[in-house]
């Protein structure tokens, strides 16, 4: 069975949900921006965690373009939208930078800008 040309990605924030189509070679943040959805981001390199989201399903995201992404991040369902490429249909809770920074601190992993994590 061949891979689909695009994946459905549902972006969740509060009580709002927006669905976009994202090709496997496109970063999720870029596809959202093209669709008129402005998500948090700063470095666009997968380092600062500003773009962090969290999977709300068992989807798969390729984070090979990320400067810092750890197995613990994947296990906890965190994704970096600015460098993540979909490998399946996804449901992602956006605006998760604070939660990801707190998680990283709890695992003694680098958490840039973690003074904002509480």
Give residue spans per PLM region:
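N-terminal pre-ligand scaffold of iron-sulfur
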Residues: 1-39
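N-terminal start-of-chain detector that recognizes signal peptides
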Residues: 12, 21-27, 51-56, 62-67, ...
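Short, flexible, mixed-charge glycine/proline-rich loop motifs
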Residues: 40-42, 73
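Iron-sulfur (Fe-S) cluster-binding modules
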Residues: 1-4, 87, 93-118
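Iron-sulfur (Fe-S) cluster-binding segments and ferredoxin-like electron-carrier domains
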Residues: 34-35, 50-100
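Cysteine-centered iron-sulfur cluster-binding motifs in ferredoxin-type domains/subunits
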Residues: 42-49
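Functionally engaged cysteine thiol sites
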Residues: 12, 43, 82
């Amino acid at each position: 069975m061949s891979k689909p040309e695009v994946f459905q990605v549902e972006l969740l924030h509060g009580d709002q949900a927006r669905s976009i189509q994202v090709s496997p070679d496109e970063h999720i943040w870029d596809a959202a921006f093209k669709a008129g959805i402005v998500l948090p981001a700063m470095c666009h390199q997968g380092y600062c965690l500003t773009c962090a989201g969290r999977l709300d399903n068992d989807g798969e995201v390729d984070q090979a373009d990320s400067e810092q992404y750890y197995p613990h991040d994947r296990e906890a369902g965190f994704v970096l939208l600015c460098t993540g490429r979909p490998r399946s249909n996804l449901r992602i809770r956006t605006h998760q930078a604070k939660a990801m920074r707190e998680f990283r601190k709890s695992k003694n992993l680098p958490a840039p800008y973690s003074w904002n994590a509480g």
